[in-house]
């Protein structure tokens, strides 16, 4: 039996199919006095729409050269979608008319809704309620609409970049309509075609996540590009990203904003370490979303992936006619994390037989200025270069000619020889410009003739795109983690360090034993029973960071030292925090010897839910802020990836004579801490273990703190 969620997802997908593939459109509020109406109507001809367009105007008459219906109901035939361009005060009436006509897809250009404040938000809620009561799929309000380039369906209210590049494979989704236009314009200038261009605006109904979910199944779309200001449906976006990764459709995303979510995290460290932006960054790493920071990198990365797809062998061969460009490319490849291996001796020998006497067979390969005299040098050098067993992808730097005259001349011949060399090499290959430059129609024709994958990206953006494409391919090969059943719900609500450590122990996390004492004599007796040096820590529900106020003493041994330590801790804390309630003092065995202190902290993000941060712990957690983050639940394998991402990762493998920790044991402990936090339910604000002491023989929680929502 299908789940309700599956039925809802199918209904949503069907709704978007009806919208994005509409064959008849009503232009509600059509008037030749409006630039929006003029552009929207002109786009049907510009894009080659073959369906029917129905202007709707209260005054009737002729609008845009067609007879205008006075209402949607007066059109007199079924209509797939409506574009509402009426003033805000007329939207409700226009929507009711659209509903009466049985139109079940709407794009609302009109602004004046949630973006203007509380009153506008109430109007938007009423609009959404009207849409849902009639089963209407609503895009907007306050959006420019969409263009389905693949099926030639434009419900878009500004002029798109022309001419349309056929066969576009990148679906662009943006919460900002203007930014969607900027992305489309830049892609068009670079000769990179789009399959879709969608502005979601206020996202009263259709949001970015729903459009991504649609594009994952769209046959014309090979890559998805996003511009996000916020995320309105994080669970669906995460699920869609997982489906995209499984399907081999990369998602390249710009997300603006880096605000913190720490306000409700009480005094826990985790709130300052896990913020909105850092959680989104973690989501990208976890789900294979390629995050970029500018339109250029979005377009070039998506354009590269649309052309070369998944690259299995991620070792790069660099080729240029310039030694200086070769050196720049090598530097940028290293910065992008791309391996540029040395060539094998047989490859060097084969290249010596081809290159001029002054040429040197290296990777990067400078084919030398000899190619200016004999363009076939590219066609003769690329096959032996590409045959080297250490290479997986070839990147050759050469600007694409702009004009028909150049293409017919020597510059065009060089590109043709590069194309011949690429084909003969048997390797995936891409040609990159030396500096960022547009691609003309004549240039696109030459690329089609030579079957060359090309980016007019320049060296830096091009190598960055290759690095990101390689990282995405590597992430995809690791696969999408299998869904894990939620952990068994805990029936306790631990408060205080002692109870939290005991709870972690019950969930399979090794934790140091602690005993609460209320007098110096009890402290001494407990220490003697432990039979070695001890740690004393203040126990108070009002104090999270004990060491800051003298609430922790280490390595105490002997009755006198323990008794004196008890008195000193109590006196110090009472002087620093006289208002704090004191439960007593905790006594724990002192752990000596080699080891690394780690930090593991869980925080419930308001958008994405529970997330876990792992980093170097103890006093370094705030000083270094060196953490890796993932959404929960995590597997031990994912935690191993997190540990490898830390800037201080080399400390885990032994440093200056100290033994390496057991990373697998540490990862198991962190994964169990994450499961333990999930089991405590939504009232948990944060759960921290600091430090989690990792050694060559295992991992042990030495201190823990749970913070609860007082209203939960």
Ranges and model annotations:
Residues 1-712:
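Catalytic-core regions of core metabolic enzymes
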């Amino acid at each position: 039996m299908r789940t309700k969620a599956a039925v809802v997802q199918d209904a949503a997908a069907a709704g978007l199919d009806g919208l994005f593939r509409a064959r008849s459109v009503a232009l509600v509020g059509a008037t030749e006095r409006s630039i929006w109406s003029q552009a929207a109507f002109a786009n049907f001809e510009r894009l080659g729409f073959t369906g029917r367009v129905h202007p709707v105007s209260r005054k009737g008459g002729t609008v845009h050269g067609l007879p205008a219906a006075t209402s949607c109901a007066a059109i007199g035939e079924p209509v797939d979608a409506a574009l509402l361009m009426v003033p805000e005060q007329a939207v409700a009436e226009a929507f009711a008319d659209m509903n009466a006509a049985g139109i079940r897809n709407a794009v609302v250009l009109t602004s004046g809704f949630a973006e203007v404040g509380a009153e506008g938000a109430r109007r938007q809620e009423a609009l959404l309620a009207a849409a849902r009561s009639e089963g209407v799929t609503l895009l907007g309000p306050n959006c420019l609409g969409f263009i389905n380039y693949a099926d030639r369906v434009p419900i878009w209210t500004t002029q798109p970049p022309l001419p349309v590049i056929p066969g576009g494979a990148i679906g662009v989704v943006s919460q900002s309509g203007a930014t969607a236009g900027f992305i489309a314009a830049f892609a068009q200038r670079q000769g990179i075609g789009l399959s879709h261009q969608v502005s979601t605006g206020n996202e009263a109904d259709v949001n970015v996540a729903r459009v991504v979910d649609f594009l994952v199944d769209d046959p014309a779309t090979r890559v998805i590009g996003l511009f996000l200001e916020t995320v309105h449906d994080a669970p669906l976006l995460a699920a869609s990203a997982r489906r995209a990764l499984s399907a081999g459709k990369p998602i390249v995303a710009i997300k603006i904003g880096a605000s913190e979510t720490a306000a409700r995290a009480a005094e826990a460290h985790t709130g300052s370490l896990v913020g909105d932006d850092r959680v989104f960054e973690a989501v990208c790493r976890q789900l294979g979303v390629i995050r970029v920071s500018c339109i250029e990198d979005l377009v070039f990365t998506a354009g590269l992936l649309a052309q070369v797809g998944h690259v299995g062998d991620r070792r790069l061969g660099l080729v240029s006619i310039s030694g200086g460009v070769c050196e720049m490319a090598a530097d940028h490849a290293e910065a992008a994390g791309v391996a540029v291996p040395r060539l094998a001796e047989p490859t060097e020998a084969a290249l010596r037989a081809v290159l001029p006497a002054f040429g040197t067979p290296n990777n990067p390969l400078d084919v030398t200025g000899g190619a200016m005299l004999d363009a076939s040098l590219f066609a003769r050098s690329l096959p032996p270069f590409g045959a080297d067993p250490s290479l997986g992808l070839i990147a050759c730097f050469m600007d694409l000619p702009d004009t028909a005259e150049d293409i017919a001349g020597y510059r065009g011949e060089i590109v043709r020889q590069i194309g011949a060399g690429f084909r003969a090499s048997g390797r995936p290959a891409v040609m990159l410009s030396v500096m960022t430059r547009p691609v003309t129609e004549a240039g696109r024709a030459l690329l089609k003739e030579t079957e060359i994958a090309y980016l007019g990206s320049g060296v830096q953006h091009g190598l960055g795109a290759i690095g990101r494409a390689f990282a995405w391919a590597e992430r995809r090969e690791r696969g999408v983690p299998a869904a894990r059943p939620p952990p068994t719900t805990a029936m306790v609500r631990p408060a205080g360090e002692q109870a939290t450590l005991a709870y972690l122990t019950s969930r399979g996390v090794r934790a140091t034993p602690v005993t609460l004492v209320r007098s110096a004599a009890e402290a001494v007796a407990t220490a003697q029973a432990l039979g070695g040096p001890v740690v004393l820590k203040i126990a108070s529900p009002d104090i999270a960071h004990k060491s800051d106020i003298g609430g922790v003493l280490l390595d105490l041994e002997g009755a006198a030292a323990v008794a004196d330590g008890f008195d000193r801790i109590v006196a110090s804390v009472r002087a620093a925090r006289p208002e704090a309630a004191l439960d007593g003092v905790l006594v724990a065995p002192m752990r000596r010897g080699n080891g690394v202190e780690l930090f593991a902290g869980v925080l419930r993000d308001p958008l994405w839910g529970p997330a876990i941060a792992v980093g170097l712990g103890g006093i370094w957690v705030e000083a270094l802020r060196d953490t890796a983050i993932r959404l929960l639940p995590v597997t031990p394998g994912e935690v191993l990836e997190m540990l490898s991402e830390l800037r201080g990762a080399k400390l885990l493998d032994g440093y200056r004579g100290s033994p390496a920790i057991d990373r697998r044991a540490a990862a198991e402990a962190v994964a169990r801490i994450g499961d333990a936090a999930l089991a405590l339910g939504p009232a948990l604000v944060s759960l921290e273990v600091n430090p989690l002491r990792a050694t060559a023989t295992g991992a042990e929680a030495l201190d823990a703190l749970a913070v609860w929502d007082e209203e939960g």
